[in-house]
Amino acid sequence: MRALVTGGTGRVGSAIAARLEKEGWDVFAAGKVHGDIADVEAARAVVQTAVDELGGLDLLVHAASDGFVPKPVEEVTEEDWDAAFGATAKGGFFVTQAAAAHLRESGGVVIMIEDVMGLEPWPSFAPHSAAKAALSMLTKVFARALAPEVRVCGIAPGPVVVEPNQEERRAAESLLGRIGTPDDVADAVLYLAGAAFVTGTTLVVDGGRLLQSARSIPT
């Protein structure tokens, strides 16, 4: 079994790659050193490099994302907007497009790492929230476009990486009393990779956060 993980050197992506390897997958963990997938040619090259190294492709996990710093919507710049959509939405589209033929051949799976910020409005993370919402729609678009040979699913984690002074607050927003971990996301990836009758849907991995009051959403 052969997997490409974009954002594979980040905290969440590396946990996904490590878990897949532990389960016997051959993994190509793509990071910035392999190219900026916000660039179309770089995105295609990353896929080709992975296919050449692995001998094919059974799973694409798109975990690449931006590192947006929260700010009021009045202060968001064009550069902020472009950076948010670059690796997340644009990169997700063109990496999946490039991988599609290989995944059709293997009957493979695409898993988009979305975010609960793409399912609810977070004003202080406007570009990131909008980019993740776009990625959520791409999950559905590709599920229809690549069926029946390829399944496409999404995972929307709640807060996973937070500042130490915010951990208690974020944990209180979860019904389970803690924030998520990269391993929680990796568990969901393994489930969806083997869930043969699941496609076109997003699995929310947030400890029940979305069931809490919308008043907890920061402004």
Where are these regions (language model features)?
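N-terminal Rossmann NAD(P)H-binding glycine-rich loop of SDR-like oxidoreductase domains
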Residues: 9, 17
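Substrate-binding pocket helix/loop in short-chain dehydrogenase/reductase
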Residues: 71-73, 80-82, 170
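Conserved NAD(P)H cofactor-binding loop of Rossmann-fold oxidoreductase domains
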Residues: 63-69, 207-208
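Alpha-helical segment proximal to the catalytic Tyr-Lys
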Residues: 101, 143-148
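C-terminal substrate-recognition "lid" of short-chain dehydrogenase/reductases
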Residues: 182-205, 210
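Conserved Rossmann-fold SDR core element
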Residues: 56, 136, 146-160, 198-205
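Active-site helix of classical SDR
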Residues: 96, 131, 139
